[in-house]
Amino acid sequence: MATVTDINQSQTSRVAKVKPSSTDFMEVGSTGLNQTAGIVNDDFLRQLQGKQAYANYREMADNDPVVGAMLHAIEMIVRSVDWSVEPSNRDDPRAIEEAQFISTCINDMSTSWDDTLASILTFLVYGFSYHEIVYKYRNGYTDDAATRSKYNDGRVGWRKLPIRAQDTVQRWDMDDNGGIRGMYQMDPHAPDKGLVYLPIEKCLLFRTTTKMNNPQGRSILRNAFVPWYYKRRIQEIEAIGIERDLAGMPVAYVPPQLLSNNASADERAALSAIKQIVRNIKRDEQEGIVFPLAYDPDTKLPAYDLKLLSTGGRRQFDTNQIVTRYDQRITMTVLADFLLLGHEGIGTQALSVSKIELFLTSLNAYLSNISETFNSYAIPRLMRLNGVSEELSPALTYSPPKNIDLEGVAKFITSLAQAGAPLFPDQDLENYLRGMAGLPQGQAEEV
């Protein structure tokens, strides 16, 4: 009776097959990305559009100590991560063999894996990084760099994944729906090569975000630009103020005739020279001024004079607090404000741990981005070049970075032991705890 009911239900729930329309299998709209002829101008700040954006982001990364510390911390953590290649099916010998093959390809490139990761990580600064895939035949230790390999199996492997610098991007090749077909590169240091086209099938594109399929992603420093911009100018004003406080503010006294509208050409030239002297006064090992000595015939006072006015007392604003505030804003934009804990005399251990864990969580997303790009594009393409089914494509994986609180783990285990939990002897648990602490694995006792 139940069987009849199930059959009747399946028959009544079946609907007539609808014929798809002509537009169901085609893309009608577009992403809406603000781009013209492949030139992306999606940011509303003019300073962060085109080549000027690359220059500003590079200045932030190379000149600002706080931004540099954030990026250095990210790179060092990524370099310390353990990467591995997992087979698509652990029970299939062919899948295991292909996983081993990809692992050898990663370690057989002319550029080390760590250095390759370092160049990939520039996508954090600029929003994207574009890498050309250069293949090679693995023909052992030959004199030809195009075929030199640690392995002599004749298979196609990766020779290198060189970056194509972000500031050499001339424009993108995009279809009518916003899909990315490739990139046109113009290297200013190799103008003879002209405009070079790099199709997306031959490259890997790493991005912080795929919003609106923007090929340039979004720099992690984007939200830090405004506080960095004001911080840099406040530091410049601060340096000028310090110099003026130490050297004094120069004041030049000149005859009124030099400042009048009917001053002669010689008088205007003299005034211009005196202004230049005032602007260039600095305290250094070559300090000194040559100034005319002349007296007013009526007052018998010097017609020309130069004085340095010193300022007394404190300024109305504490620039140190202002710069510190902007430093905090900069680190907060990438969840790295734990770097400043202790510098301001505030912060607790618990707060530090929670902030570091939040930072590592965000970093884990970037690592996932890198591995997904390899798993979706680089590895399947290499499989096809070697005539291997993509079903056997292995996956590039990594061990997520963790902030292990060994003291907290020790207290937790102690509490379990005091509660009567049977923890030891347990060789697996012991080895796991040893691994957390970076200690060598223990030897199981023979029975």
Task: Label each PLM-derived region with a short phrase.
Residues 2-68, 72, 76, 88, ...:
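Structured, contiguous alpha/beta core segments that scaffold functional sites
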Residues 1-28, 269-308, 388-447:
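C-terminal anchoring/interaction modules
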Residues 252-253, 291-293, 333, 342-343:
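Short His-Asn-centered micro-motif
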Residues 90, 136-138, 294, 311, ...:
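An acidic- and aromatic-residue-enriched active-site/binding cleft used to recognize and process polar
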Residues 317-447:
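C-terminal helix-loop subdomains that flank or include functional centers
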Residues 264-268, 313-321:
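Ordered, soluble secondary-structure elements with a strong preference for glycine-centered loop motifs
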Residues 91, 95, 307:
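Cation-handling catalytic/transport regions enriched in His/Asp/Glu
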Residues 76-81, 244-255, 300-311, 338-339, ...:
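Short acidic (Asp/Glu) and glycine-rich catalytic loops that position anionic groups and cofactors
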